[in-house]
Amino acid sequence: ALAAVLGLGPKVHPGGSSMGGHISLSWAAAHPEEVASLWLLDSGGIWSGPTSELAATIQRTGVNMLVASNEEEFHRLFQFAMSKPPPMTDGMLDVLAQDRIRNHDLELRIFAQVRGDHLEDRIRGLRVPALIVWGREDRAIHVGTADVLHALLPDSRVVVLDGIGHLPMIEAPGRVVADYLALRDGLH
């Protein structure tokens, strides 16, 4: 009933990237009657996929390349997350860096919490139309995880984008939006 309480209508179209995908999947598992479709971009929460570079690095060194406590770590994160980072001014990068640095401790706590969430058990067989988008060059969550997620969601379709990393909506926004609009158009 959350969608109705928020005035969003009887059914919504949640979507998200990485951790946002994990959150969208969690909501869909808890409230499938409220979900018209899912849009999942390099979604987190699927732990049985192939080991990613990020997972191997965390296991080997304890360093999570997706969090930043200073500007140097943010620039490393920015390069790690994307295969084709868009051009940005120094001012834009500074704003993004300060936001991530400010949230460093919170992000570490959230990563620890979601790591213990066994989402796969809750979404197996979920009958919701879903578009699964993945960057083939994703170093944070292995592209093979898209196939695992697809097997869990029988009404899903997978789009893998060559030359794209963990953030396809930033690296290839035109293609990502076109695929999403096609999903929505196909629901009517």
State the predicted function of each range:
Residues 16, 20, 24:
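Gly/Ala-rich beta-loop-alpha elbow adjacent to hydrolase catalytic centers
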Residues 1-11:
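Conserved acidic catalytic loop of the alpha/beta-hydrolase fold
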Residues 25-30, 34-69:
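Flexible "cap/lid" loop of the alpha/beta hydrolase fold
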Residues 155-188:
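Catalytic active-site module of serine/aspartate enzymes centered on a nucleophile-bearing elbow/loop
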Residues 126, 132-134, 138:
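Short beta-strand/loop motif that positions the catalytic acidic residue
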Residues 14-16, 41:
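Short beta-strand immediately N-terminal to the catalytic nucleophile in serine-hydrolase-like folds
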Residues 49-55, 67-125:
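Conserved alpha/beta-hydrolase catalytic His-Asp/Glu region
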